[in-house]
């Protein structure tokens, strides 16, 4: 059909490729040197978890800014973003796109919180790929406070809105252990939820969100 899609790759100039030879023993705390060198680094300790959060935020923030830049170039109405774009959240790794996009719309684009949440919720969709724990991420709130403190108030607001609407602890974004359930955020603040295959959709129906009776999954 003569259509061409662009593949955008994000990187930072400070990355030190010489540390690749160190393999999995590299210094995970040297974020400016290793941020984009190793995908899914060892997360068996706190430093590895924080690096993953840094990586995820780096990618989603760049993507959010790119989407808004391209919409401005095309003179699209940001308040109808969902008419021009769909942001597909595959697994929970890009889940921070939701609070990040809300943050930018509120801080830089003169949206109210309600307006930003509505637009983002109509633009983002979530696809479950697995039921493995590493895919359905649950980040300690304290980790997010270290890496992305600017997103924490937004995540708390999103969680509070869910808590005001649903009392079931199984569907909360921030649980009683102060862990942020990224999949729950995607489910509550996306317009579509499905599995990458039929079995993954059934997993969503039968296991993880057994209390999401307010949702209709395909």
State what each model feature region is:
Residues 106-156:
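Extended, well-ordered alpha-helical scaffold/bundle regions in very large, multi-domain proteins
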Residues 213-218:
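Conserved small/polar residues in nucleotide/adenosyl-binding loops
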Residues 61-65, 100-107:
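Alpha-helical support elements that line or immediately flank enzyme active sites
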Residues 3-86:
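Function-dense linear segments that define catalytic or interfacial modules
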Residues 88-100, 123-127:
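Core structural elements
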Residues 187, 194-196, 203:
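Extended catalytic-interface subdomain
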Residues 153-179:
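Polar, glycine-rich mid-to-C-terminal structural blocks
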Residues 70-82, 105-118, 130, 134, ...:
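Secondary-structure transition/capping motifs at alpha-helix termini
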């Amino acid at each position: 059909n003569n259509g061409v899609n662009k593949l955008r790759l994000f990187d930072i100039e400070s990355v030190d490729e010489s540390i690749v030879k160190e393999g999995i023993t590299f210094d995970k705390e040297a974020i400016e040197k290793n941020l984009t060198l190793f995908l899914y680094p060892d997360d068996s300790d706190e430093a590895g978890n924080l690096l993953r959060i840094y990586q995820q935020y780096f990618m989603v923030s760049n993507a959010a800014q790119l989407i808004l830049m391209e919409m401005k170039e095309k003179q699209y109405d940001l308040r109808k973003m969902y008419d021009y774009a769909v942001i597909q959240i595959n697994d929970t790794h890009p889940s921070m796109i939701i609070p990040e996009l809300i943050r930018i719309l509120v801080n830089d684009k003169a949206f109210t919180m309600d307006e930003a949440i509505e637009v983002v919720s109509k633009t983002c969709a979530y696809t479950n790929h697995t039921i493995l724990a590493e895919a359905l991420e649950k980040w300690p709130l304290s980790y997010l406070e270290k890496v992305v403190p600017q997103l924490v108030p937004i995540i708390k607001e999103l969680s509070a809105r869910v808590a005001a609407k649903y009392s079931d602890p199984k569907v909360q974004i921030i649980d009683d252990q102060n862990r942020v359930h990224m999949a729950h955020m995607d489910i509550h603040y996306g317009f579509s939820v499905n599995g990458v295959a039929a079995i993954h959709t059934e997993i969503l129906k039968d296991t993880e969100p057994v209390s999401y009776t307010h949702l209709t999954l395909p």
